[in-house]
A protein has these predicted regions:
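Domain-level signal for soluble alpha/beta catalytic cores
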Residues: 1-370
Length: 370
């Protein structure tokens, strides 16, 4: 088994909020809510350790949304409360919509203070106090998500008459975030990035083209900006990225394999590992993994978080073998395809089903890699 992240058995980040915490979010504020979150996080860290995971997150228990909670805290970005972003998600029963407030870049982008710093410090101290050797992991949205969610219309041309200045400021703010979080002791940081998966879907590219983006080449811009944000990452910090096609209340937003982005994504993005959604036919085949260079890790998201039904070990092992035809088995790890609760509402499965899936991942990884 691996002793550094990403681990053979790993997970993306978000976990179902306990009912008591959901009630607390409705009735408590300030210190009282923080105490309820602290209690829930201590317990979920214990559960991750008990299952046998080598990394632990705080389940994103303090967030309402995996990405917007972060993005709105960047200096220069605000909520356009009179307008909403509409993201349409799909499931077997039909369509549902996620409608956060739209964002506006109204000043030059900057990092006023490290975002989620107190949250990470609490997770770090909780993990350290247990003396289990588990590595605390922080997840944040990729810089790509600021542009993907807002688009050109969200950027005030009076602030950024030259869009290249927008990109430079955005990457600089993220670079400072990475540095400051590293100074707090973070050695495992993940950039969550649905955009690089969405761009494989022709319908998504058509939508970006309609708003004025160069959709066919947008993934190259996003890769460039992520690399700029990571150019001075702290020594000893592992950076991974997670990609999926949407995860809201057991629904998805996009479909398509990784073919459109694969060669540039795997060959040029300067991260240590890729968490990739592969739980059903929407994700395509494993053939794009042939572009993964030696030394980079691929975390196969073979276990779905969208349903409670437990996968079989034999099926997981067979699919790992299939992936190993395109990338060396020693470069492969195993995880769920996404988080279990990308937003506070969570996916449609129980906490017991969630933890059973994480336990299955640990057991399968032990049997495959020893």
């Amino acid at each position: 088994m691996r002793t550094s992240p990403p681990f053979r058995a790993d997970h993306v980040g978000s976990l179902l909020r306990p009912p008591a915490l959901l009630r607390a979010r409705e009735t408590l504020t300030g210190d009282a809510l923080r105490e309820a979150e602290d209690e829930a996080i201590r317990e979920v860290v214990r559960r991750q350790e008990e299952i046998g995971l080598q990394s632990a997150t705080d389940g994103e228990f303090r967030r309402a949304s995996w990405h917007m909670d972060f993005i709105y805290r960047l200096g220069g970005i605000g909520q356009a409360t009179d307008e909403h972003i509409t993201v349409r998600f799909h499931n077997e029963q039909g369509d549902i919509e996620f409608t956060p407030a739209a964002l506006r870049v109204h000043e030059r982008i900057r990092l006023n203070e490290p975002i989620f710093a107190d949250d990470f410090a609490f997770l770090r101290d909780t993990v350290t106090s247990r003396n289990s050797g588990v590595v605390p992991k922080l997840t944040i949205p990729s810089p790509s998500m600021v542009h993907y969610r807002g688009g050109p219309a969200a950027i005030d041309p009076a602030v950024y008459p030259d869009v290249e200045e927008f990109w430079r400021d955005l990457s600089a703010a993220y670079a400072e975030q990475v540095r400051r979080i590293g100074a707090l002791g973070c050695t495992y940081l993940q950039f969550d990035d649905t955009s690089l998966a969405y761009l494989n879907d022709p319908a998504q590219r058509a939508e970006l083209s309609s708003r004025g983006d160069d959709a066919e080449h947008m993934h190259l811009r996003y890769i460039k900006q992520i690399n700029a944000a990571l150019a001075a990452k702290p020594a000893g910090m592992t950076i991974t990225t997670h990609m999926c096609r949407g995860n809201f209340r057991s629904s998805w937003a996009a479909s398509g394999g990784y073919d459109h982005v694969a060669e540039a994504l795997f060959g040029e993005l300067k991260v240590d590992g890729f968490f990739l959604e592969f739980d059903d036919e929407r994700s395509g085949g494993f053939e794009p993994l042939r572009f993964v260079p030696p030394g980079k890790m691929v975390v196969l998201g073979l276990v779905t978080t969208k349903r409670g039904e437990l996968e079989s070990k034999d099926t997981l092992k067979r699919r790992i073998d299939e992936a190993a035809k395109f990338v060396d088995l020693d470069q492969i790890c195993l995880s769920p395809q996404c988080g279990f609760s990308s937003t506070v509402e969570g996916n449609q499965l129980t906490a017991d089903e969630q933890f059973a899936k994480l336990r299955l991942i640990v057991e399968t990884a032990q049997e495959v890699w020893g």
